[in-house]
Amino acid sequence: MPFTFHDTVRWVKNLAKIFRVEDKGSALVALKEKKYREEIGLIMQKTVGKRVIISSSGPDISWVLEIVRECGMEIIRAGYLSSPYLMKDKQKISDISIIPDYTLEKLYDDIKTYRPDLVLTTIWLDHKKANVRYGMIPFCPNVGFFGALSSMKHWTSILFGPVTEGWRNYL
């Protein structure tokens, strides 16, 4: 299933061609693209130039790389934690170096060294070790024109919260 806007556009156009309703497919894409561009524009006001580290044990992070880039964020590191679910050879975006076997220790070292604005990961981080804003990458992201965008909206909101919430003082 398509997670990103661009994947969904290709999917809709292919289906429209199969069913010989290209005009309806194009109309749907145009309608959704207008809304998508508006939403991306709002998000970019908050994300352009922000630095992010991406660390995943999930099967495919290409959709995360795509939406993060589209929102103008700088990807400092992207890596796969060891996992039986990996599909490293199926990555659609290959212009950055994705680190295979990215260890948790290396992730914490990179957080300390590069001080990113945000870490996106599939694992819970030790807040005392990480001391960084981080968001979870869903194993089953939303699909469709606005699938990846919904995750990006959530991650954007994390950028403006405190690094450590008050309740954590009691842990």
Segments from the language model and where they lie:
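An N-terminal assembly and electron-transfer interface module characteristic of large anaerobic redox
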Residues: 1-171
